[in-house]
Swiss-Prot record:
CDD domains to which the protein is assigned, alphabetical: ABC_PotA_N
Protein name, as recorded: Spermidine/putrescine import ATP-binding protein PotA
Biased composition (Polar residues): 1-18
Every ABC transporter domain range: 30-264
Main function: Part of the ABC transporter complex PotABCD involved in spermidine/putrescine import. Responsible for energy coupling to the transport system.
Family, per entry: Belongs to the ABC transporter superfamily. Spermidine/putrescine importer (TC 3.A.1.11.1) family.
Span list, region Disordered: 1-21
Catalytic activity: ATP + H2O + polyamine-[polyamine-binding protein]Side 1 = ADP + phosphate + polyamineSide 2 + [polyamine-binding protein]Side 1
PROSITE patterns: ABC_TRANSPORTER_1, ABC_TRANSPORTER_2, POTA
Membrane association type: Peripheral membrane protein
PANTHER family (UniProt xref): SPERMIDINE/PUTRESCINE IMPORT ATP-BINDING PROTEIN POTA, SPERMIDINE_PUTRESCINE IMPORT ATP-BINDING PROTEIN POTA
Length: 465
């Protein structure tokens, strides 16, 4: 489903801190200043989003990533104008649009449900918004043709939606949202209904299209692979807050919090006690040395925002499974080394997963690339050594209780669940004019909204003045 509601940037760091790096004289495409959203339930305020400060650069592919209930879709709907912030301001291209209705915001929104008009062919669906704006004749044909070329659907211009695959329908919805040249495009899990192979293909195509048109894309997803594949930057959300904002590589390689380390990819978390601090560790970087067994070694460089540490402090060391090597003898050198016994072996094609129980009682996962096809390097029950470079591990402060995902009490559906696969899309009254609308004769000054309980069929839509 496409909808209408724009702006240009900055940077937000851990826990919602805000900095601006859009460049002198260049406003953020989308900027949130202290934005919060509470829902009133049984006479009390339930926070769904808690003070988000965020700035998205012009032409950036930016993702909001997090589990269901973290507030990412609620944040997106506030930007689109479908939800009103309880506190804070929303700016699009430097203009405060907090109180501006969705149809007055220069952004378009693509939902997981594409809501293509079944009585119109592909070209008609793409042209619909242009016709609503009074574009006619040669300009209409050229703009529709260019957009169909962009999404590689020119040869299917005369087909109806029912004659298209899921991926083709998704591209029609994308073309319909882009043809009006919005300042920014908001996408709420648009690939969620596609199968795995098609979803992976569409990720590459979507990023290529974004790069070609140069429009700011704000993408909401719970899928780490989607965010890592397509994004220039990612904001990881949890409990209504931004836990970390960084590039995909930094999010994966240098998580700032225990939640990010556990949510992004697979991480091994080892709780240990600080034995000593080395001000000049490997590479001259400050290093923390942790307690380990006889002949074992554990250390990691210190990164902000770890904070000051002292001997005896409890910390967690995190290391990714693919960074770990296995050997039958104790490895030489200054790297990390632990002994263990293999308790599980799972063959997954491109790699094999080994679960290793260390002598300290912690289970560690190892991903071993199957590059030679020679079979397993070790078997269940084998005693082995695990090793990795200290710079491949990361020290996190002692874990604290993590906030639970926000869910409204009682039978109320949490805001985040609205556009999941078994959902019906946004509430009835929030579809802006030149997105999901009725036949071409409708006056462009009129707002078209679906009648309660109806499908995406334009015949079921009514006019609201």
């Amino acid at each position: 489903m496409t909808a209408t509601s724009g702006a240009r940037t900055s940077d937000a760091r851990t826990s919602g801190a805000r900095t601006s790096d859009a460049g002198i004289g260049s406003p953020a495409a989308i900027e949130l200043v202290g934005v919060a959203k509470d829902y009133q339930t049984r006479g009390r305020a339930v926070p769904a989003v808690s003070r988000v400060d965020l700035a998205i650069r012009p032409g950036e592919f930016f993702s909001l990533l997090g589990p269901s209930g973290c507030g990412k879709s609620t944040t997106l709907r506030m930007i689109a104008g479908f939800e009103e912030p309880t506190r804070g301001r929303i700016l699009l291209q430097g203009r405060d649009v907090t109180a501006v209705p969705p149809n007055r915001r220069d952004v378009n929104l693509v939902f997981q449900s594409y809501a293509l008009f079944p009585h119109l062919d592909v070209a008609g669906n793409v042209a619909f918004g242009l016709r609503r704006r009074g574009v006619k004749g040669r300009e209409l044909r050229e703009r529709v043709g260019a957009m169909l070329d962009l999404v590689e659907l020119s040869e299917l211009a005369d087909r109806r939606p029912r004659e298209l695959s899921g991926g083709q329908q998704q591209r029609v919805a994308l073309a319909r949202a882009l043809v009006n040249r919005p300042a920014a495009l908001l996408l709420d899990e648009p690939l969620g209904a596609l199968d795995l192979k098609l979803r992976q293909t569409m990720q590459i195509q979507l990023k290529a299209i974004q790069r070609e048109v140069g429009i700011t894309f704000l993408y909401v997803t719970h899928d780490q692979g989607e965010a890592l594949t397509m994004s220039d930057r990612i904001a990881v959300m949890n409990g209504g807050r931004v836990e970390q904002l960084a590039s995909p590589r930094d999010i994966y390689e240098r998580p700032r919090t225990r939640f990010v380390a556990g949510f992004i990819g697979t991480s091994n978390l080892l709780r240990r006690t600080v034995r000593a601090l080395d001000a000049a560790g490997p590479g001259g970087r400050p290093t923390v040395v942790l307690d380990a067994g006889t002949d074992e070694r554990l250390s990691a460089p210190l990164h902000p925002p770890t904070g000051p540490l002292r001997a005896g402090d409890q910390v967690e060391l995190t290391v990714r499974p693919e960074k770990i090597e296995m050997s039958v003898s104790r490895p030489d050198g200054p790297g990390c080394a632990l002994r263990g016994r293999i308790v599980e072996v799972v063959y997954l094609g491109t790699y094999t997963t080994y679960t290793v129980a260390t002598h300290g009682g912690t289970e560690i996962t190892v991903f071993w690339q199957n590059s030679t096809g020679a079979g397993n390097v070790a078997e269940r029950g084998d005693e082995i050594w695990l090793s990795w470079l200290p710079e491949h591990s990361y020290v996190l402060p002692e874990p604290v209780a993590l906030p639970e995902p926000v869910a409204l009490p009682g039978s109320v559906v949490p805001p985040e669940t609205v556009n999941q696969p078994d959902s019906v899309g946004p509430p009835d009254s929030i579809i802006p004019p030149h997105s999901v609308v009725a036949p071409d004769s409708v006056d462009p000054r009129e707002t078209v909204v679906p009648a309660a309980g109806t499908s995406a069929d334009p015949a079921a839509y009514r006019i609201s003045h």
